[in-house]
Amino acid sequence: MSLPEFSMRGLLESGAHFGHQAHRWNPKMAPYIFGARNNIHIIDLAQTVPLLHQALKAISDTVARGGRVLFVGTKRQAQEAIADAAQRSAQYYVNSRWLGGMLTNWKTISASIQRLRKLDEILASGAGGLTKKERLMMSRERDKLEKALGGIKDMGGVPDLIFVIDTNKEQLAIQEAERLHIPVAAILDTNCDPDGITYPIPGNDDAGRAISLYCDLIARAALDGISRSQGMGGFDAGELEAPVEDLPPVEGEYEAAPTEIFELLDAPRGAPDDLAKLPGSGPQIVKKLNDAGIFHYWQVAAMTPEDVAKLDHDLKLSGRIERDGWVNQARSLIAS
């Protein structure tokens, strides 16, 4: 097995090149920005490609030496991808909430992990001798600890490298890693601060497809490290995941890429658009859209028929999106 292959086109198709609105940028990210389009910064993927390769090599080398990699991503879009990637590559993860001291106060965290293990044992044995109320309280405590610590309960000590999605949200994790001199590989969107990041990877940290791609590549790099450490002794790590298609490199400017990728957001990027201008919408429907993570015309304009059907079903809009032509109307509002 070798380091996972990827291409600039693959990154483009995942939406990795879309940054935030230009006024929300961090000036320290200027070297990684290609330009702006429709007031959205475009990330320079010509720099992302070699930097991502460097991060993948660092992760593979860390695991090959017997080191541990901790995946960190607690935002909604990243939670599932982070857990799946860590589990596939026999590594560790935090995808719920970063507890203060997870790295710098490992002794206390270890005590909580021991408590989790004890609760698992008691409940697995049937919790004989306990009342129904005691079993219920114990089960709730176990579930709470599992949610917070389940991804690191087998880690056995602080990690040798951490991989982070959204450095703004995971600032506490990065600060703790810095204090312990633990290398950090991180996805850096245009509103992030690259200072203190050992292996910066410029890219969109909100789009679900991009996050899934990053996590898959990191997981496969860790699997490559496992293969190297075991000398491939009958262990075919390549069977554990589907390869990322190696597409031909993209030539020319980024305008050749897809216009937008539909994604849900935790918060608006800058000022939200007036979604009440969409036909048949009103305050209640706008609130439903905002609660679902839709704040801008460009999100609606980027929807595929499958996206329309799913959102209509989830929000119980009775076919309104397609019937009232929201996608075309959103495109018109963007153009006006």
UniProtKB/Swiss-Prot annotation:
**Which HAMAP family does the record associate with it?**
Ribosomal_uS2_B (MF_00291_B)
Q: Which GO terms describe its biological process?
A: translation
A GO-annotated cellular component: cytosolic small ribosomal subunit
Q: What is the lineage of its organism?
A: Bacteria, Pseudomonadati, Pseudomonadota, Alphaproteobacteria, Hyphomicrobiales
Q: What is the name of the protein in this document? A: Small ribosomal subunit protein uS2
This protein's gene is called rpsB
Q: Which InterPro entries match?
A: Ribosomal_uS2 (IPR001865), Ribosomal_uS2_bac/mit/plastid (IPR005706), Ribosomal_uS2_CS (IPR018130), Ribosomal_uS2_flav_dom_sf (IPR023591)
Q: Which family does it belong to?
A: Belongs to the universal ribosomal protein uS2 family.
Which CDD domains does the annotation name?
Answer: RPS2
The terms under GO molecular function for this entry are: structural constituent of ribosome
Q: Which UniProt keywords apply?
A: Ribonucleoprotein, Ribosomal protein
Against Gene3D superfamilies, the record matches this protein to: 5' to 3' exonuclease, C-terminal subdomain (1.10.150.20), Glucose-6-phosphate isomerase like protein, domain 1 (3.40.50.10490), Helix hairpin bin (1.10.287.610)
Kindly give the PANTHER family that the UniProt entry links to this protein: 30S RIBOSOMAL PROTEIN S2 PROKARYOTIC AND ORGANELLAR, SMALL RIBOSOMAL SUBUNIT PROTEIN US2M
Q: Does the keyword Protease apply?
A: no
